[in-house]
């Protein structure tokens, strides 16, 4: 690698806003905040949330008096 052209990598504290967990990685920034991570994403946790679309449709129809 050429000297003097690559950024300096420093320890970076990455904080997941949703779960509040922190991990440390190497980056060019000292700190990052992310909305979702493998600690709280349904794919990784196995806790899928199934949307009750039928209930939502019925609620919508009731609200606007639709048949």
UniProtKB/Swiss-Prot annotation:
Keyword rRNA processing: no
Keyword Oxidoreductase: no
GO terms under biological process: translation
Molecular-function annotations in GO: rRNA binding; structural constituent of ribosome
Assigned GO CC terms: ribonucleoprotein complex; ribosome
Keywords on record: Ribonucleoprotein, Ribosomal protein, RNA-binding, rRNA-binding
Pfam families reported in the protein's UniProt record: Ribosomal_L31
PANTHER family with a match to the protein in the record: 50S RIBOSOMAL PROTEIN L31, CHLOROPLASTIC, LARGE RIBOSOMAL SUBUNIT PROTEIN BL31A
NCBIfam families associated with the record: L31, PRK00019.1, PRK00528.1
Function: Binds the 23S rRNA.
Family listed: Belongs to the bacterial ribosomal protein bL31 family. Type A subfamily.
Quaternary state and interactors: Part of the 50S ribosomal subunit.
Name the UniProt record assigns to this protein: Large ribosomal subunit protein bL31
Organism listed in the record: Helicobacter pylori (strain G27)
